[in-house]
């Protein structure tokens, strides 16, 4: 069977943990519950899932393999509802979910063929007509926002490339198709998405050439990044489907090999563009990072980071780090001054516990900052400075520790969910108050006053 090198574009995100046959059955039950069996395509998919359940329970005895199976099933379970929603953004997200899950079972294509069969069925729910409508909706909105005539013109070609390619796959996947394997291979070599990269390349070029410095510019770049993610996810899933079709005995191995190479075109160049955007040692990217990070902040950020990981984009490990725990918070400008549990400002002398605060990561990736007392106070923004209080202030008490580097030193900028464009800084005097300013402090003449350090207080961990 043809080598699976085509999938080298995907990170091998191996699922951890042990899944029993009962757990697999439970996962499949969850998948079946999300399938609309009243629709013809849904009924066919439902029956195939039921059959796959029997095969999996008989075939896999190794714990690691069962865990991989669960990874693929989990991706299908989340994707089916998105495919059936009719929402173009959710459909694109469903494609990405499948790409993430399938990366865990790529080592042995033959052994996991039942799962690939179901994948083909799920992809098949995305019919040719819906493909044209959905892809058109996904890209049209963002392209219109860019007011870019060249991109708008290229859009029409992209819609046709995707729709015709899906129509071809839906046709040959049909069990009544009388095409021979060699005919399928010949046709597969000429489906439009096989060659179509112009629009995606244009989107990347726009991102590369735009240095976002204002909130509106940053939001446009984020929209372009999301557009790129949607387009590549859709295209890669179509190519995956096409590869499955022609990488089986009887088809042309040369065509299968060609499909692998097409997927890799431009990948390294694209990765370099994204890695430049995520640099933590470049002051030009700091404001952008405050809008993209944390990765859990919204569906847009989640999708972009998930795709970056699939593309193996390199970035600062701290963008994945969880800072939850007891931390000592200080300023690079006044390294001996700490944000104390008993005060609302950086102080030279803190009462016990010495400069220790509790950080808790919230569902949206932002952090709450609390004192470590039995009846803790919560840190929040009050106007342009910070206070500790027992009152709740919603988004004003959600903070973002944006990881940056000064030389080789790993430090943080402090912003909030409510105002990602405003950053904390300390005055040059030793008073220690924390103020917020609109923009990156170091670019506004504040030097090191807007850089902060965090250190785990091992003695205060609970």
Curated annotation (Swiss-Prot):
Domain of life: Eukaryota
Biological process, per Gene Ontology: killing of cells of another organism; monoatomic ion transport
Protein function: Critical allergen and main toxic protein of C.quadrigatus venom. Has potent hemolytic activity. Is lethal to crayfish. Causes cutaneous inflammation in humans. May act as a pore-forming toxin, disrupting normal transmembrane ion concentration gradients in susceptible cells.
A GO cellular component entry from the record: other organism cell membrane
Residue ranges of coiled coil: none
Temperature dependence: Heat-stable protein that continues to cause erythematous skin eruption in the patient and to recognize IgE after heating.
Keywords (A to Z) from UniProt: Allergen, Cytolysis, Disulfide bond, Glycoprotein, Hemolysis, Ion transport, Membrane, Nematocyst, Secreted, Signal, Target cell membrane, Target membrane, Toxin, Transmembrane, Transport
Name of the protein in its database record: Toxin CqTX-A
Gene Ontology MF terms in the entry: toxin activity
Similarity comment text for this entry: Belongs to the jellyfish toxin family. Type I subfamily.
Localization terms from the record: Secreted; Nematocyst; Target cell membrane
PTM section of the record: Contains disulfide bonds.
Residue positions the entry lists as glycosylated: 174
The organism of origin for this protein: Chiropsoides quadrigatus (Box jellyfish)
Signal sequence range: 1-19
């Amino acid at each position: 069977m043809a080598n699976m090198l085509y999938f080298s574009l995907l990170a091998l995100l191996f699922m951890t943990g042990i899944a029993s046959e009962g757990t697999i059955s439970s996962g499949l039950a969850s998948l079946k519950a999300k399938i609309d069996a009243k629709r013809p395509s849904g009924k066919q998919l439902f029956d195939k899932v039921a059959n796959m359940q029997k095969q999996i329970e008989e075939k896999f005895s190794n714990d690691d393999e069962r865990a991989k199976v669960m990874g693929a099933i989990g991706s299908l379970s989340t994707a089916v509802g998105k495919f059936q929603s009719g929402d173009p953004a959710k459909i694109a997200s469903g494609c990405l979910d499948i790409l993430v899950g399938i990366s865990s079972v790529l080592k042995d294509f033959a052994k996991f063929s039942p799962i690939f069969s179901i994948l083909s069925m799920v992809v098949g729910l995305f019919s040719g007509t819906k493909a044209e409508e959905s892809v058109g909706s996904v890209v049209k909105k963002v392209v219109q926002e860019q007011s870019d005539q060249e991109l708008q013109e290229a859009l029409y070609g992209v819609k046709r490339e995707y729709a015709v390619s899906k129509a071809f796959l839906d046709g040959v996947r049909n069990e009544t198709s009388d095409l021979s394997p060699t005919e399928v291979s010949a046709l597969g070599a000429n489906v439009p998405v096989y060659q179509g990269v112009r629009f995606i390349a244009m989107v990347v070029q726009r991102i590369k050439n735009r240095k976002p410095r204002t909130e509106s510019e940053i939001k446009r770049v984020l929209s372009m990044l999301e557009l790129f993610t949607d387009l590549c996810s859709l295209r890669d899933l179509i190519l995956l489907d096409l590869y499955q079709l022609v990488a089986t005995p009887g088809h042309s191995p040369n065509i299968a090999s060609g499909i692998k190479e097409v997927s890799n075109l431009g990948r390294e160049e694209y990765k370099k563009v994204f890695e430049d955007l995520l640099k933590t040692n470049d002051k030009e990217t700091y404001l952008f990072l405050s809008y993209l990070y944390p990765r859990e902040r919204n569906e847009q950020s989640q999708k972009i980071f998930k795709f970056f990981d699939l593309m193996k984009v390199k970035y600062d490990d701290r963008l994945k780090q969880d800072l939850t725990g007891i931390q000592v918070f200080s300023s690079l400008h006044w390294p001996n001054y700490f944000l104390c549990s008993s005060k609302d400002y950086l102080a030279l002398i803190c009462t016990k516990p010495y400069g220790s605060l509790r950080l808790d990561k919230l569902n949206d990736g932002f952090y709450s900052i609390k004192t470590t007392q039995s009846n803790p106070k919560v840190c929040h923004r009050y106007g342009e400075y910070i206070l500790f209080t027992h009152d709740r202030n919603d988004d004003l008490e959600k903070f973002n520790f944006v990881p940056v580097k000064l030389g080789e030193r790993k430090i943080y900028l402090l912003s909030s969910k409510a105002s990602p464009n405003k950053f904390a800084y300390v005055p040059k005097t030793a008073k220690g108050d924390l103020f917020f300013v609109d923009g990156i402090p170091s670019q506004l003449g504040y030097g090191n006053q807007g850089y902060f350090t965090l250190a785990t207080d091992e003695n205060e961990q609970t």
